[in-house]
Regions:
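Long, compositionally biased
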Residues: 44-89
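N-terminal acidic leader/helix
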Residues: 2-35
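Basic, amphipathic alpha-helix used for nucleic-acid engagement in HTH/winged-helix/SANT-Myb modules
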Residues: 1-2, 75
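Amphipathic alpha-helical segments that form the core helices of the histone-fold
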Residues: 30-43, 48-50
Length: 89
């Protein structure tokens, strides 16, 4: 197992524990981990679960989608900055 795979595995496991601790299925956690797309995003989700104690699956999924949207906005901003830097040089 590569170091990167190990990080992913550990982050996914933390999410599974957090989600099952509040009474939801491990399958939901696995799907969320895949959708979030990075260990840092997964850790943000785990932090949300521990702080907010969501009561419904909808609350979990809504936060997951918000995190994904923020990451996509950040990626687009970085791409735009890189394109602008290439254009200006």
């Amino acid at each position: 197992m590569t170091p990167n795979q190990y990080l992913w595995s550990q982050a996914r496991d933390r999410l599974v524990v957090a989600v099952t601790d509040i009474g939801f299925s491990a399958e939901l956690a696995e799907l969320m981990a895949r959708q979030l797309g990075s260990p840092k995003a997964i850790d943000r989700m785990v932090s949300y679960i521990r702080q907010a104690h969501p009561r419904t699956e909808e609350m979990l999924v809504d936060e997951m989608l918000a995190i994904c949207a923020e990451l996509e906005t950040w990626r687009q901003k970085k791409e735009s900055q890189e394109a602008q830097a290439r254009y200006n040089s």
